[in-house]
Every structure is written in structure tokens, then in C-alpha cells.
């Protein structure tokens, strides 16, 4: 798969280059996707339980980098950062898709909305990567999450308040109806061999808790931007200002 080529093939190539040019520090941005549908508040000690090729290849790449570090542990530093879902200005990932649906008034809340979603603002992730350059030798593994977590009701309400000055969530539909629509979409995908924007797995992911913890606080790192500030900056940049000519980035 493309993930095998990029994550596993990329890890092999990077380790070869590090060997060739005597580079002793590697920072790898992995993902909390290695944990799959993890229990709430899963930390760095959580067991790998990935459910797709993205999570699998991120985890297998981690093992490749660990093997590289193990060859010369007294001199080599490996930093593995496992971010949760990342958002920010110009980022075209899953959070942007949600923001865009709400902005275009095409969003329906499925389920109670009481499930929590850990998120990470891109500026903070970049700041932590820079901060980690000073870590010593060894293997350093961190989840990256900006706290406190929003539940879906609060997240959607905050977005609608900023975009429409409305202090509500909008239309809700029960979970069983949402899942039924997802299974119908799965069947249509099989019949017509064409991926649809909705699926049972996407609805399950949307309505499940995706809440992680991190030991980053122990490293002394302080995020430069709060989660709510990052969300407000992103909404303003994407929907309240004219930034159509600015660069955009497509991510998983």
C-alpha cells in the first residue's frame, strides 16, 4: 500500500541515510492510530491495536527506528511523537472536513455528542518537535495532545458560535440511524466499487471516544497556543478571512 511505501519504506531509507552520514538523532512523527479504538486516557504505554494500514505501518516504522537506535544506544537518540488528530491553518485533514461541513451547513450530529476527542494544534506540534531536538540519547516516546479535550457537543457549539454566532449544536440524529446509514453506504461501496464520504467505520470513529493522555508535561514543554486559541485561529483563517491564495496541506 501507499502507507507501506511511505512509512515503512521511508523508515528503512532514513535509517540507511543516518548510518551513511553518521546522524545520531531521528525524530519520527508516528500517530495515536497505532492504538486503534483505545480505552479512554490511553497513554504511551498503551498496547498497539491498529485497525487499518495507516496505524499498522506507523507502528512497524517505529520498530524499524528502534532497531536503528539499538545498534548504538549510547550515542543515538530516537524521538517518537504520536500526535492525535492534527488541525491548523491550511491543513486539509479530518478536522478541516468537520469544520467545512459545519460552515457549509451540511453537518448532522450523530449520537449524544458526549464522546471526547483529543486534538492537536499544528503550531504546538511543530514547537514540540523543535523542543525535542535537545533530548539526550535513548528512546523517547510521547503522545501529543493539546488539553483539555473537547467533547463533540462543546466542539460543535464552539465552532457554530464563532461562525454563525449561534450557541447551539444544530440537528441531532440517533446513533442507530447514523450507523444504519453507514452500513447502507458500505453496501453501496461494494456494489458500485466507489468510495463514499460516509461509512460505518467513519461513523463509529466519529461517535467513539478518542481521548488520550501524554507524559509531555514531565518534559517541561509548554505549548505556545491553547487548544481553543488554535481552533479560533483556524476558523478565522479558513472561513472568516480571504486566504484562498495561501498554501494548503493535505494530510491523513
List the model feature ranges, each with a label.
Residues 132-197, 225-235, 242-252:
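Mid/C-terminal beta-alpha module of Rossmann-like enzyme folds, strongest
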Residues 51-79:
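Active-site Tyr-X1-5-Lys
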Residues 13, 91-97, 110-133, 140, ...:
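Substrate-positioning beta->alpha
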Residues 12-54:
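Conserved Rossmann-fold NAD(P)-dependent oxidoreductase catalytic core, especially the SDR/UDP-sugar
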Amino acid at each position: 500500500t501507499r502507507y507501506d511505501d511511505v512509512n515503512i519504506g521511508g523508515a528503512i531509507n532514513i535509517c540507511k541515510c543516518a548510518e551513511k552520514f553518521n546522524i545520531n538523532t531521528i525524530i519520527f512523527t508516528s500517530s495515536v492510530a497505532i492504538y486503534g479504538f483505545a480505552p479512554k486516557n490511553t497513554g504511551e504505554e498503551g498496547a498497539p491495536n491498529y485497525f487499518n494500514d495507516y496505524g499498522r505501518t506507523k507502528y512497524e516504522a517505529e520498530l524499524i527506528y528502534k532497531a536503528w537506535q539499538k545498534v548504538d544506544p549510547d550515542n543515538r537518540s530516537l524521538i517518537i511523537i504520536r500526535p492525535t488528530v492534527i488541525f491548523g491553518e491550511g491543513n486539509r485533514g479530518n478536522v478541516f472536513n468537520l469544520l467545512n461541513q459545519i460552515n457549509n451547513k451540511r453537518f448532522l450530529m450523530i449520537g449524544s455528542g458526549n464522546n471526547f476527542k483529543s486534538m492537536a494544534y499544528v503550531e504546538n506540534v511543530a514547537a514540540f518537535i523543535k523542543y525535542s531536538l535537545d533530548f539526550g540519547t535513548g528512546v523517547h516516546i510521547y503522545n501529543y495532545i493539546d488539553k483539555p479535550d473537547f467533547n463533540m457537543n462543546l466542539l460543535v457549539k464552539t465552532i457554530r458560535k464563532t461562525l454563525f454566532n449561534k450557541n447551539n449544536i444544530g440537528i441531532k440524529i440517533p446513533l442507530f440511524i447514523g450507523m444504519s446509514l453507514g452500513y447502507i453506504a458500505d453496501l453501496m461501496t461494494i456494489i458500485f466499487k466507489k468510495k463514499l464520504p460516509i461509512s460505518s467505520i467513519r461513523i463509529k470513529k466519529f461517535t467513539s471516544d478518542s481521548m488520550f493522555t501524554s507524559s509531555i508535561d514531565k518534559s517541561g514543554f509548554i505549548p505556545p497556543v491553547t487548544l481553543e486559541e488554535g481552533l479560533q485561529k483556524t476558523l478565522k483563517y479558513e472561513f472568516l478571512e480571504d486566504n484562498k491564495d495561501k498554501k494548503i496541506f493535505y494530510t491523513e
